Design a protein with these regions (language model features):
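N-terminal leader/linker segments that initiate helical-solenoid repeat arrays
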Residues: 21-80, 84
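Canonical positions in the second alpha-helix
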Residues: 71, 104-105, 138-139, 160, ...
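Short coil turns that delineate tetratricopeptide repeat
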Residues: 76, 110, 144, 165, ...
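Residue-level recognition of tetratricopeptide repeat
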Residues: 87, 121, 176, 213-215, ...
Length: 324
């Protein structure tokens, strides 16, 4: 097992000047979005542009954006119109525009927790973890003592059944920001609270996954085993099957070759593959197989799916290695 003192080292992203990237283009006046623009700088110093979207997905996302834009144009100060415009922009990888939309919304509705929740999520996407945490902590403060609400899915699952709520998504993303920075200790109480409050198996497995990894990174193997104890093959998940299979791997109930299927050839890896691959990579790392872990993390980063949490987490692992 890798020593916990090494694994728990906080992540502090290097300061990189975006204007120093010679490949960046300048937006022209009146242009809503230049597809060559830099959306973010990775934790490894790479420029990140638009999301890699398939020819099958792109038209649907663009149609959804047009619908959200139309609703926004009709009611530009309505909080829901603002939120959906920002969400639809973000699905297309237009993250900076989405952040700007949420920021304008906050100027109109400064007490609306949904706006901070969504802007915080997108600050994670662009690797601005401190800003993400500030927004998500603000969102959390705004919902104290208020009833929870189901969060509508932007891309509904197979049963068209939302699995998340406002409160749970605030906490999920806040704890994730701590995890990605390497501040595993601060993530723990948030994960425990969310695990206690989870009302469906999709939430249970997604929270248990990151909670387990946080405990293992801190060298708390017994507590981590306790998180795994209630996980079983019979859990009813709608969209988080990857997390369930990874947890069963960690529990010793699935072989690794049944969890990570070969990546599709000839294109960018899927979000699901990036998520699962990170789970396998960290499993190797936790069991002392550094070379195997490094190989998988590099494969994820080469895959191009830079908005996936598994991609960001793999990037963070590689960035820590550079600074050792």
């Amino acid at each position: 097992m890798v020593a916990s003192t090494t694994l728990a080292r906080p992540l502090f992203a290097a300061v990189i000047t975006i204007t120093g990237c010679t490949s960046r283009s300048v937006d022209t006046p009146g242009t809503v979005f230049d597809r060559r623009r830099v959306e973010a700088i990775s934790l490894l110093g790479d420029t990140l542009r638009e999301f890699p979207l398939s020819a099958e997905v792109l038209p649907r996302y663009e149609r959804q954006l047009a619908e959200a834009r139309s609703a926004y144009d009709r009611t530009p100060t309505n909080a829901d119109s603002i939120i959906w415009l920002g969400r639809r922009l973000a699905y297309l990888g237009r993250i900076r525009e989405a952040i700007d939309v949420f920021t304008r919304g906050i100027s109109i509705h400064p007490q609306n927790p949904w706006l901070y929740r969504h802007r915080g999520h997108r600050y994670i996407t662009v690797r601005e973890f401190d800003r993400a945490m500030a927004d998500l902590e603000r969102a959390a403060s705004l919902v104290v003592g208020k009833p929870d609400e189901v969060e509508p899915d932007g891309q509904p699952n197979a049963l068209n059944q939302p699995i998340g709520t406002l409160h749970s998504n605030i906490d999920y993303h806040l704890a994730l920001a701590h995890y990605l920075k390497g501040d595993f200790e601060r993530a723990l109480p948030i994960y425990q609270r969310e695990l206690d409050n989870a009302r469906n198996d999709d939430r249970r497995v997604s929270i248990a996954y990151w909670y387990y990894l946080s405990l293992r990174r801190l060298g708390r193997a017994d507590a981590a085993a306790g998180v795994l104890a209630p996980i079983s093959r019979g859990m009813k998940v709608i969209e988080n099957d990857s997390y369930l299979r990874l947890l069963l791997l960690y529990k010793g109930e699935l072989p690794v070759d049944s969890v990570l299927v070969p990546a599709p050839g000839g294109g960018v890896m899927s979000v699901t593959y990036a998520t699962t691959a990170y789970g396998i990579g960290i499993w190797h790392l936790l069991n002392g197989r550094d070379a195997e872990a490094d190989q998988i993390f590099r494969r994820i980063v080469a895959g191009g799916q830079w908005g996936a949490f598994g991609y960001i987490a793999a990037e963070a692992e590689l960035a820590r290695r550079v600074r050792r």
